[in-house]
Amino acid sequence: MMRHLLLVGAAILIFVSDAQAQGDGEDPCQIVRCSYGANCIAYGDTAICECPFGYSGIRCQDPS
C-alpha cells in the first residue's frame, strides 16, 4: 500500500491511502474507516483521512 504524507496548516496531517473503490460507484470512505473522529474525504476513488491533532497513520489510528 502506497502512502503519502501531506502537511496541511500547523496541526492537521493527511494520509492518502491507495484504497480503491470496487468500480461500482461505491464511496471509498465506506471502505476506509478513519479513527478518532477523523474526517474522510473521497477524492475520486481514493479515501483521505484528515487526522485530528495528536493522531497520525493512514486511518489516524496512531497517537502521535
UniProtKB/Swiss-Prot annotation:
Gene3D superfamilies: Laminin (2.10.25.10). It comes from the Eukaryota. It is found in: Secreted. The keyword Amino-acid biosynthesis does not apply. One of its GO terms (molecular function) is growth factor activity. Albumen gland. Up-regulated in adult CNS after axotomy. The keyword Coiled coil does not apply. Residues 1-21 form the signal peptide. Keywords: Disulfide bond, EGF-like domain, Growth factor, Pyrrolidone carboxylic acid, Secreted, Signal. Induces neurite outgrowth in specific adult neurons in vitro. This is Epidermal growth factor. It comes from Lymnaea stagnalis. The lineage of its organism: Eukaryota, Metazoa, Spiralia, Lophotrochozoa, Mollusca.
